[in-house]
């Protein structure tokens, strides 16, 4: 038998062996022998890892986790989900949409209040950017945001949308967020904060999309521009000014709309940062912002983010930290 034929036969035998083992594991789970099946999955995981069969280990743990989730065995399922991450961390697996979708699927099935879920998402985001201090791949953030939106966890969904490139999805979530939790006089506040924070994250494209989509879809906003709400007019002018990059326009705009900007003490802090990023305004002389506002702004900016270049999220796929 030639070498290629021998390799093909070996591969077929291996697949057949894996399928038989998985069949036994599934039967154990369906009989209710959860502990036995869980331990067997772990044994196979370490066996595959010792043989550097990373893809096989990852797929087996993923399918096993789904099986345990389908039988409401949260602890076993969460453990196998963590092993999926362990494979990714220890192998040279590239970040691909299919893997990100698998991670998001596991996240969606975990108990919403479990500590394992928080640990899982933290490790998954860290892996998705190569283990650096950056806060995760935009695609993974988008998938997490969509799951949290379905769970009506709007604040967490908003956080992940801000680190994605999905301005349209973010806007639609914000409309629902306002309808569920907001007051009528806050219709403009929901989108203004999102636009300003997207701009602070150097994501001009998503800032524009979230504004246009929100103002088009929101049932309480009359068609514009111009808008009835002064703050919405300010945001519209600001996005135009960012495209133009003229400091005088930005300065006059901020002065003219001060009454609207005083509605939230963070707005001027965000605008200081936007002035630096898009209009060449030098940073303040003080080494850092102080007090509560400083803590909030620093959490938005990240502690050591490089300011060089004004890039959109599609070009800069490592958004800065936002707590």
Curated annotation (Swiss-Prot):
Location of region: Disordered: 303-323
Compositionally skewed regions (Acidic residues) per UniProt: 304-315
Top-rank taxon: Eukaryota
Keyword Zinc: no
The keyword Transport belongs to this UniProt entry's keyword annotation: yes
PANTHER family in alphabetical order: GOLGI TO ER TRAFFIC PROTEIN 4 HOMOLOG (PTHR12875:SF0)
Subunit organization: Component of the bag6/bat3 complex.
Protein name as catalogued: Golgi to ER traffic protein 4 homolog
Lineage: Eukaryota, Metazoa, Chordata, Craniata, Vertebrata
């Amino acid at each position: 038998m030639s070498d290629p034929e021998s390799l093909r036969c070996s591969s077929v035998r291996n697949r057949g062996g894996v399928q038989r083992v998985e069949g036994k594991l599934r039967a154990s789970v369906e009989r209710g022998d959860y502990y036995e099946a869980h331990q067997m999955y772990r044994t196979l995981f370490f066996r595959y890892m010792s043989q550097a069969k990373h893809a096989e280990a990852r797929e087996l743990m993923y399918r096993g986790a789904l099986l345990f989730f389908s039988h409401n065995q949260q602890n076993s399922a969460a453990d196998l989900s963590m092993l999926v991450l362990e494979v990714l961390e220890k192998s040279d697996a590239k970040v691909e949409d299919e893997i990100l979708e698998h991670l998001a699927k596991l996240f969606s099935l975990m108990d919403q209040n479990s500590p394992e879920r928080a640990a899982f998402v933290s490790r998954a985001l860290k892996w998705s950017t190569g283990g650096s201090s950056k806060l995760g791949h935009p695609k993974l953030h988008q998938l997490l945001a969509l799951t949290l939106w379905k769970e009506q966890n709007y604040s967490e969904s908003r956080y992940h949308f801000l680190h994605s490139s999905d301005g349209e999805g973010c806007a639609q979530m914000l409309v629902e967020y306002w309808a569920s939790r907001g007051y009528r006089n806050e219709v403009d506040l929901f989108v203004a904060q999102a636009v300003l924070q997207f701009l602070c994250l150097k994501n001009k494209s998503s800032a524009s999309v979230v504004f246009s989509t929100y103002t088009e879809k929101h049932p309480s906003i009359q068609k514009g521009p111009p808008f009835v709400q002064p703050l919405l007019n300010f945001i519209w002018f600001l996005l135009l000014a960012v495209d133009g990059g003229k400091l005088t326009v930005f300065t006059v705009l901020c002065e003219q709309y001060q009454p609207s900007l005083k509605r939230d003490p963070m707005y001027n802090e965000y605008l200081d940062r936007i002035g630096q990023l898009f209009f060449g305004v030098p940073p303040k002389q003080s080494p850092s912002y102080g007090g509560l506002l400083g803590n909030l702004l620093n959490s938005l900016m990240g502690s050591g983010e490089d300011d060089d270049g004004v890039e959109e999220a599609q070009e800069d796929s490592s958004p800065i930290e936002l707590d």
